A protein has these predicted regions:
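Leucine-rich repeat
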Residues: 1-501
Length: 501
C-alpha cells in the first residue's frame, strides 16, 4: 500500500506544470501521520527541498522543517535586509545542505564573503551583477564538487584573470559566462584546458563586453601565427549540444580551433564588429559538427538608417519557428550594403559545410526608413561568393530590394554571365508580387533553360491592405499558403519556408 501511495505522490509531482510549485508536498504531509512518514522517507526520490525566496521566513523554516536540501533563489529582484539575514544564516550554518544558489547584487557582495567553505551538495550556482562596479568574487576556499550548472554574469570570477572558479570544477553540464570584461581575462588556452576536463558539458555560453579587443602579443594581420600558437590542446566535447558566443570573431576562431563538438545542434554567434578576416577554423569546426545540418536558410540585410544595421543569418528546419528559436543564428553589425554582402560572403564561405545541405534560400533587405542617395554598387563576385556554398538549393526567394540588387550580378548588361557553379540545382524562383518584377532575372533563367536546367517562377502572395506597390511588405512571403500549380509567374507560391511571427 505504501508503494502505491508513493507512486501516486510521484505522479502528483510530475503533473505540476514546469515544476514551479516548490511546496507541492506541504499539504500532503499534513494530511496524516502515515503520509508524512512516506513522504519524508522518500524525500530524495520525490526531490523535496526547502525553497527560500523573497519574503520567506528562513530562520523559522530552518528551525521547524526537516533537514531537506535548500534552494536559495533571490536572482530576480533586490533582497530586503531580513532576506539577507536569513540567507546569511543558511550559508553560514547549513552550507552542507544547499543545492541551488541564485543571488544578485547588491546583496551578493556581502553574501559571497561567507561562502569560503565546501558546498558538497551544491548543483546549481548563478551569480548576477548588472553593474561590474561591484566586482564580487567568490573566496578561493569555495568548493562545490557536485556543481553541474554554473552561470556568472558580470561577477568578479569572470573578470578576474584565469577565472579561478573553473580550476576546481570538472562535472559541469552547463557553463554560462557573461559580461566578461576582456578576452585577455579568459585566455583561449586556459579555457580550453578547463573545457577538456568537462566531458559532460551540454551547453556553453560565452558573452564578452563590447570593448575593443587586440589579440595579446600579436599584430592584427598576423592571424595564422595567432591560431598556430593556440594549437596546444584539444577539448573533445562529445556531449555539447548548444554553443552561444558573443564577442570578437578572432577569439572565436582561436576557440573553435581547439574544440570538437560532433553532436552540436544549436549554434548562436553574435560578433561585435563585421568579420574582417577569413574564418577557416570555424569552417573546420562546422565540418565536424555533422548534426548541425538544416534545409532552410535566410539572409537578412538592413538599411543604414536602421537602429542597428547589420546582417542576420538564420538556418533552420522547414517547420514554423521564430528567429530567436532557430537552431543556428549569426549576426554582425555593418552599415553599407556593399560591405554587408562582402562580409556575408566571407561568412557564407566559412559556413559552407552546413550550407551545402540547404534546399531553400531566402534573401531579404529590411529598411523601415529609406535613406537618400544611391546605394553603393555591390561587386558581382561578392554575390557569387555568397551563393557558391549553396550547392543544393532548389528554391530561391527574393524580396523587393534583393531581386534588384542580385539581378545586376546574375544578369549583367555587359560582362560574363553568372558562373555555372552558382545555385546549380535551382528549380524554383520566388519573386515579389508586383508586376514590375516580372522580367527580372529572365536572362539568367533563359540561360539555365538552354543548359537543360529549367527554373519555374512564382510570385509571393500580395501584402494585405497594401495601397500601392511601394508598400511592399518584406514579410509578405509569410502570407497565407495558397495552391501552387505550374502556370508560371501568374500563380502565387504555396511554400512557406519560415514563420518568423
Amino acid at each position: 500500500m505504501d508503494d502505491i501511495l508513493l507512486e501516486i505522490f510521484h505522479c502528483y509531482r510530475l503533473d505540476i506544470p514546469w515544476g514551479w510549485d516548490h511546496k507541492w508536498w506541504y499539504k500532503l504531509m499534513h494530511t496524516c501521520r502515515r503520509w508524512r512518514y512516506i513522504i519524508l522517507e522518500s524525500s530524495s526520490s520525490l526531490q523535496l527541498h526547502l525553497y527560500f525566496t523573497h519574503g520567506k521566513p528562513i530562520g523559522e523554516m530552518l528551525e521547524h522543517s526537516p533537514p531537506l536540501p535548500l534552494f536559495i533563489d533571490y536572482g530576480k529582484t533586490e533582497m530586503s535586509t531580513k532576506d539577507e539575514e536569513g540567507v546569511l544564516l543558511a550559508l553560514q550554518h547549513h552550507h552542507g545542505r544547499v543545492r541551488l544558489i541564485n543571488l544578485r547584487e547588491p546583496a551578493l557582495q556581502k553574501l559571497v564573503v561567507v561562502m569560503g567553505k565546501p558546498f558538497p551538495m551544491l548543483e546549481n550556482l548563478k551569480l548576477i551583477s548588472l553593474d561590474p562596479w561591484y566586482c564580487s568574487q567568490l573566496p578561493e576556499t569555495f568548493t562545490a564538487q557536485r556543481l553541474r550548472h554554473l552561470a556568472l554574469i558580470q561577477v568578479g570570477d569572470v573578470s578576474a584573470p584565469g577565472v579561478p572558479l573553473l580550476a576546481s570544477i570538472t562535472g559541469l553540464v552547463t557553463l554560462s559566462l557573461r559580461g566578461i570584461s576582456s578576452p585577455t581575462d579568459l585566455p583561449v588556452n586556459y579555457l580550453v584546458s578547463r573545457l577538456s576536463l568537462m566531458p559532460l558539458l551540454e551547453l556553453l555560453c560565452l558573452e564578452f563586453d563590447s570593448e575593443p579587443f587586440v589579440f595579446r602579443s600579436s599584430s592584427p594581420g598576423n592571424v595564422k601565427n595567432d591560431l598556430a600558437a593556440l594549437q596546444t590542446q584539444m577539448a573533445q566535447l562529445s556531449k555539447l549540444d548548444e554553443f552561444i558566443f558573443e564577442g570578437h570573431c578572432r577569439y572565436l576562431e582561436g576557440l573553435v580551433s581547439c574544440i570538437r563538438a560532433p553532436v552540436l545542434t544549436c549554434l548562436t554567434l553574435s560578433f561585435f564588429t563585421r568579420p574582417s578576416i577569413p574564418l577557416p577554423r570555424l569552417s573546420e569546426f562546422l565540418t565536424a559538427a555533422e548534426e548541425l545540418r538544416y534545409p532552410a536558410c535566410s539572409f537578412t540585410f538592413s538599411g543604414p538608417t536602421e537602429e542597428n544595421p547589420g546582417v542576420s543569418i538564420v538556418v533552420a528546419g522547414l517547420e514554423e519557428f521564430s528567429p530567436e528559436d532557430a537552431p543556428f543564428r549569426i549576426r554582425f553589425p555593418c552599415r553599407r550594403i556593399d560591405t554587408q554582402v562582402a562580409c556575408a560572403a566571407r561568412v557564407s564561405t566559412a559556413l559552407a559545410p552546413m550550407l551545402s545541405s540547404v534546399e531553400r534560400l531566402h534573401l531579404e533587405y529590411y529598411a523601415t526608413r529609406w535613406h537618400k542617395g544611391l546605394p553603393p554598387p555591390i561587386p558581382h563576385e561578392a554575390w557569387f561568393e555568397l551563393l557558391r556554398p549553396f550547392s543544393n538549393v532548389q528554391k530561391l526567394q527574393l524580396e523587393t530590394a534583393m531581386i534588384r540588387k542580385l539581378s545586376f550580378a546574375l544578369c549583367p548588361e555587359d560582362g560574363p554571365p553568372a558562373p555555372e557553379g552558382i545555385l546549380p540545382k535551382l528549380s524554383k524562383l520566388i519573386r515579389p508580387h508586383h508586376a514590375r518584377f516580372e522580367g527580372m532575372l529572365d536572362p539568367f533563367i533563359a540561360a539555365r533553360q538552354a543548359a537543360g536546367q529549367p527554373i519555374s517562377k512564382r510570385r509571393c502572395p500580395p501584402t494585405p491592405n497594401s495601397d500601392s506597390e511601394d508598400h511592399d511588405d518584406p514579410w509578405s512571403w509569410l502570407a497565407s499558403q495558397l495552391a501552387d500549380d505550374d502556370e508560371g509567374s501568374t500563380e502565387l507560391d504555396s511554400d512557406s519556408d519560415f514563420d518568423f511571427e
